[in-house]
Amino acid sequence: MRLFLSLPVLVVVLSIVLEGPAPAQGTPDVSSALDKLKEFGNTLEDKARELISRIKQSELSAKMREWFSETFQKVKEKLKIDS
């Protein structure tokens, strides 16, 4: 009885496997994949440049740069006096 049930299942499985992938499941074209990758890279580059320019122009970063400059000058002056 088991053989009687397993043979049709085996035939169906083999027919599905030997049929190959469906057109929608076929391997994508390499050039389209590279185009998508290039588009993603360009988008990422644009967003990164925009973020960097926002950071450079923000008030917080200007205050931080000023604070670091002042602190660095104070440290330099202390080191000159001590030496």
Swiss-Prot record:
Keywords: Lipid transport, Secreted, Signal, Transport, VLDL
GO molecular function, one term: phosphatidylcholine-sterol O-acyltransferase activator activity
Span of the signal peptide: 1-26
UniProt keyword Secreted, yes or no: yes
GO BP annotation list: cholesterol efflux; cholesterol metabolic process; chylomicron remnant clearance; high-density lipoprotein particle remodeling; lipid metabolic process; lipoprotein metabolic process; negative regulation of cholesterol transport; negative regulation of fatty acid biosynthetic process
Organs and tissues of expression: Synthesized mainly in liver and to a minor degree in intestine. Also found in the lung and spleen.
Keyword DNA repair among UniProt keywords: no
Further comment found in the protein's record: Apolipoprotein C-I is present in acidic (APOC1A) and basic (APOC1B) forms in P.paniscus, P.abelii and P.troglodytes and perhaps also in baboons and macaques. The two genes for ApoC-I arose through a duplication process that occurred after the divergence of New World monkeys from the human lineage. In human, the acidic form has become a pseudogene sometime between the divergence of bonobos and chimpanzees from the human lineage and the appearance of the Denisovans. Pseudogenization resulted when the codon for the penultimate amino acid in the signal sequence was changed to a stop codon.
PANTHER family: APOLIPOPROTEIN C-I
Name of protein: Apolipoprotein C-I
Organism: Homo sapiens (Human)
Organismal lineage: Eukaryota, Metazoa, Chordata, Craniata, Vertebrata
Gene that encodes it: APOC1
